[in-house]
Amino acid sequence: MKCYTKTIFHEESSKSPKGMDRWLYPDMVGVRFLHAEWSNENLIAFSKKFDTLPIKLVSFELKKEISVHNCRECYFQAISNSSWANEGYLVGRHIDTHNPQLMDLLKRLHASFGIGVIDLRTNEDKSAILLNAKYKEKINYTVALELSTKNEKFSGFLKSVVDYDPDFPNRYKDEFDEVKKKEELYPNPSLSF
């Protein structure tokens, strides 16, 4: 999934009465510029003139660990703060995929609510989308407005999406999060998971 992402720090958001914004902010948002992946210039031009540009807004809730004990809470937090996007994902650094109870629970929640699940590992080959998010044609503009009003980074992310030009991708490298290599994140291999 080639996705340009931006980390959203809820600590940098405007303050509301205690508890009002609980589970409002996703940990990370992303965008896929599907038209930038096309190689046919005529198709790109056609899309720009007669169609809406094919993009996909994605929202992520990140968790260190997802277990049977915290699965529902993690999943419902992901529903709360990621359902506004075209696709929402719950991302776990450690998901015991060999636990049938956990996997069954995730599948049932996914069938009901459509939030996808990603098992994230430092070894890219071991990372996996366990359950694809159900795609929603339209984003929830009410929630997107609230997020952009309360968080400058989210508002800036939306501006970067609007301004993005696939012919000049380097211009946007500072506007989206840098994707670091595993060696930069974990210089000591014994610390990777």
Please provide the spans of the model-predicted regions.
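Charged helix-capping and loop-helix junction motifs
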Residues: 73-76
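Ligand-binding face of N-terminal immunoglobulin V-set domains in extracellular IgSF glycoproteins
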Residues: 81
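Short connector loops at helix/strand junctions that flank enzyme active sites
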Residues: 23-25, 53-57, 84-85
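Conserved catalytic cores of phosphodiester-cleaving nucleases, focusing on short active-site segments
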Residues: 28-40, 54-67
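Nucleic-acid nuclease catalytic cores
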Residues: 66-71, 84-124
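Acidic-basic catalytic patches of nuclease active cores, encompassing PD-(D/E)XK
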Residues: 1-39, 193
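Non-catalytic C-terminal interaction segments of nucleic acid-processing enzymes
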Residues: 105-193
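Intrinsically disordered, low-complexity Ser/Thr- and acidic-rich flexible linkers and loops
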Residues: 42-47
